[in-house]
């Protein structure tokens, strides 16, 4: 979609399993003012501060997806309203949620903190672009976990902030048009 100008997709033969793997690579010639940096330079994954004795909502994945009513806990790791949580355990590792209210972070999450010089929605689009790869490369056998090493190593093309704003606007516009098309099918 909008990332076509800075990404190209190639198929590579996986010599070990005879499968074709999708690889997203960067063009070597980026526009002036752009740079490619690892994800770990743009954001961090943390746990909230431990609190005990205060009744607050449990912000677990089922609640955040609207699949379950609100439950409360009297202890946990604090998350402010409008924080970003990234799913690090389970089938959908790499999925990001914005908390509608303050509460305790679910046990399958880490808080996602994005650097101030990065447009939040720009980085969320980049993370979403890599969700398939993150899901397919989980670690752990009983409960699959987000491969944090892979996540931190994702190479992100970073344009100047005003370009990030334009890219986000273009992506949102394209998604709105696609939604309109889907509604009219």
Residue ranges: model-predicted function:
Residues 127-135, 175:
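Short amphipathic alpha-helical signal-transduction/dimerization elements
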Residues 65-67, 75-128:
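A short beta-sheet element
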Residues 123, 131, 164-167:
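Interdomain signal-transducing alpha-helices
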Residues 103-110, 140-162:
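A short glycine-rich beta-alpha junction/loop motif
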Residues 15-18, 99, 142-146:
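Short helix-capping and inter-helix turn/linker motifs at the boundaries of alpha-helical repeat units
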Residues 1-5, 9-50, 55-64, 153-185:
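Non-catalytic DNA-recognition/assembly elements of restriction-modification systems
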Residues 30, 72-73, 140:
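Short, solvent-exposed loop/turn positions at domain surfaces
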């Amino acid at each position: 979609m909008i990332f076509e100008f800075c990404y190209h997709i190639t198929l590579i033969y996986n010599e070990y399993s005879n499968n074709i793997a999708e690889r997203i690579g960067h063009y070597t010639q980026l526009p002036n003012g752009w740079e490619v940096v690892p994800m770990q330079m743009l954001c961090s994954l943390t746990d909230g501060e431990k609190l005990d004795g205060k009744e607050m909502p449990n912000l677990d994945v089922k609640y955040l997806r609207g699949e379950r009513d609100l439950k409360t806990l009297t202890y946990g790791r604090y998350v402010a309203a409008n924080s970003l949580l990234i799913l690090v355990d389970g089938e959908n590792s790499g999925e990001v949620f914005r908390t509608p209210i303050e509460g305790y972070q679910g046990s399958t999450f880490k808080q996602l903190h994005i650097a101030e010089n990065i447009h939040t929605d720009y980085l969320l689009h980049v993370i979403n672009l890599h969700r398939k790869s993150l899901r397919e490369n989980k670690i752990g056998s009983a409960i699959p976990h987000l491969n944090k090493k892979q996540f931190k190593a994702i190479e992100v093309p970073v344009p100047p902030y005003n370009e990030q704003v334009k890219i986000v606007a273009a992506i949102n516009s394209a998604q709105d048009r696609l939604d309109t098309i889907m509604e009219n099918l």
